């Protein structure tokens, strides 16, 4: 895995491919729309873009997004999908066309958002999940959030995930308003509600957790759950910072995702995480290079329930590695995804 070889006069180094554990491919169309306001203002733009999507548009537009992921060093994508079942099947076709492995994280939506997001019942949602599995498609269950799924939905989806040994992914603690609404409805914070409804297990990945408090992090640690950090998107949307140092001291696994695809570069996601940890702690090397590379690959694979995935090759002659003694540290410290071939 780490032995350089020379092909066509170019020395390369093979690494496990990076795993994109959280992606909304359709949101790539919003890149460059900076605008003003906050997350909730951006969400209105996102909803309008979602409304435009059809199976045909997914088959037409997603392959380019997935090829961009591949070019950046991702070889697996977890597509957190809430556009509808036909569009999910189209996303699988798009991934096959691009040549990237896909795990469909089919989102459950009971309330909020757009009508097209919603299933009429948990039974309908689970039937859709069954249909995807029946077609041989890798899947995970994904109650969108505690905003979108009430407690009884969370309980039933959690039981299904356990019964079928499936990954469970869910957005939580991304925005203060989400936490305030959850406290008003249940008297619990989002991750506390996930724990109460059986959603926290070793197969669970909580996406963002930028505003998780210490008690919530303790719950994740006890359950063996992971956090998916998406720092380029979180920066773009003003979501805040993952409390990286407090997460690490509890031994909680971290994986990464391109999320809204405002920027597609796993090395940048990892470098952002490293920078956040340094700023929060006032120290350097809070996260080792080995740890960061594990976040980029192995932890993502664990989050998606996969054991084997494709490698990616580093161009050792790339200008960004000139004069670098340790290739792995150089990748994290100073390279972009342009270094991959």
Locate the predicted segments by residue.
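Histidine-rich, glycine-flanked metal-binding segment
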Residues: 1-15
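Histidine-centered catalytic micro-motifs
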Residues: 16-28, 167-176
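Active-site gating loops and adjacent loop-to-helix segments of metal-dependent hydrolytic enzymes
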Residues: 29-61, 109-123, 176-201, 223-226, ...
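Metal-coordinating catalytic core of metallo-dependent amide/deamination hydrolases
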Residues: 88-209
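Glycine-enriched alpha-helix->loop->beta-strand junction motifs that scaffold or abut catalytic
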Residues: 99-101, 160-167, 199-202, 219-228, ...
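Alpha-helical scaffold segments that flank or form the walls of functional sites
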Residues: 31-101, 123-134
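C-terminal cap of metal-dependent C-N hydrolases
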Residues: 311-341
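Short acidic/histidine-rich active-site segments
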Residues: 168-175, 237-240, 245-269, 306-314
